[in-house]
Amino acid sequence: MTDSASGASAVANIATPSNEPYDATRKQKSLDKTARIPIKIVPAEKLKKPEWIRVKAATGNSRFYEIKDILRANNLVTVCEEASCPNIGECFGKGTATFMIMGDKCTRRCPFCDVGHGRPDPLDANEPENLAKTIAQLRLNYVVITSVDRDDLRDGGAQHYVDCISRTRELSPATRIEVLVPDFRGRLEKALDILQACPPDVMNHNMETVPRLYKQARPGADYAHSLKLLKDFKARNPNLPTKSGLMVGLGETDEEILEVMRDMREHDIDMLTIGQYLAPSGHHLPVLRYVHPDTFKMFEEKAYEMGFTHAAVGAMVRSSYHADQQAHEAGFA
């Protein structure tokens, strides 16, 4: 297997966006979302999914439908659903979820992600209370709170994060809270100042991919800025763990992944996740390689050699997948 499949033949039917008039308030998904990004997606031959890519479905006696009902009753959104995470059956089945605050419309158009794009709705003032009550109702020992990007807000949504963290701690003081934050680009210092009022137990922000692929995969984001976010948070909170995640399969090389891992350690990032990118649809960035389990094992071994306190590395690993277990094994929960 080569490090990159970027030379795959571009054979695919090119679809066009819906003919509906453009409405910034409407949530755009799939082609409607990705058709407007600056660097167009180059179709590639679809690769056959290898046998080691296996998704665990929810079992008949799991809490899958109970969790969905509770979320709907409390007007809450999960990234598990919005991003079409392949692990949703397993996680919901075990009674865990990653809560997505501040709505379901992102101000960015990252073409690897299945979260919808559009002009976000105003913040829901009741969301911190609803979230905290749901976490208490589910009796969760560990929760992950993430969000869409909110470039429309002067603080990027930092105060809303603080409101959610503080209310959750009031109702569930024993619950550990990990946040998976956006990059707060253009308002980083303001956001970090606000988060200092009530910092999380684990600070997570995903680098996602290698710097060479940023313009293609993360339009609107900046590699150095994302590293700075985590380093600056760590400088303010030296006893709190920082965490970041990467996808493989977008056209990067193994050495580029290792170089990002070195950059992470140079910026005091403690915990690492690496997983296989799986395209949500034919209108998202194509999978250019399926990384072999032996290569994931190599990444894991190198991570511990570099000094990461914990490395969750494998095809089906996602940033918040088994996050409680990751934090426990790293000695933080």
From Swiss-Prot:
A molecular function GO annotation? lipoate synthase activity
What are its GO cellular component terms? cytoplasm
Domain Radical SAM core: from-to ranges: 91-309
Question: What stretch or stretches form a coiled coil here?
Answer: none
Keyword annotations for this protein, in alphabetical order, are: 4Fe-4S, Cytoplasm, Iron, Iron-sulfur, Metal-binding, S-adenosyl-L-methionine, Transferase
Give the EC number.
2.8.1.8
What enzyme class is recorded for this protein?
Answer: transferase
Q: Which reaction does it catalyse?
A: [[Fe-S] cluster scaffold protein carrying a second [4Fe-4S](2+) cluster] + N(6)-octanoyl-L-lysyl-[protein] + 2 oxidized [2Fe-2S]-[ferredoxin] + 2 S-adenosyl-L-methionine + 4 H(+) = [[Fe-S] cluster scaffold protein] + N(6)-[(R)-dihydrolipoyl]-L-lysyl-[protein] + 4 Fe(3+) + 2 hydrogen sulfide + 2 5'-deoxyadenosine + 2 L-methionine + 2 reduced [2Fe-2S]-[ferredoxin]
InterPro entries found in the cross-reference section: Aldolase_TIM, Elp3/MiaA/NifB-like_rSAM, LIAS_N, Lipoyl_synth, rSAM
Manner of cofactor binding, per the entry note = Binds 2 [4Fe-4S] clusters per subunit. One cluster is coordinated with 3 cysteines and an exchangeable S-adenosyl-L-methionine.
Pathway stated in the Swiss-Prot or TrEMBL entry: Protein modification; protein lipoylation via endogenous pathway; protein N(6)-(lipoyl)lysine from octanoyl-[acyl-carrier-protein]: step 2/2
The record's section on Pfam families has:
LIAS_N (PF16881), Radical_SAM (PF04055)
Q: Does the keyword DNA repair apply?
A: no
- Amino acids binding [4Fe-4S] cluster 2: C106, C110, C113
Domain of life where this protein originates: Bacteria
Q: What are the names of the required cofactors? A: [4Fe-4S] cluster
- HAMAP family registered for this protein in UniProt: Lipoyl_synth (MF_00206)
Q: Which family does it belong to?
A: Belongs to the radical SAM superfamily. Lipoyl synthase family.
Instruction: Supply the name of the protein.
Output: Lipoyl synthase
The organism of origin for this protein: Ralstonia nicotianae (strain ATCC BAA-1114 / GMI1000) (Ralstonia solanacearum)
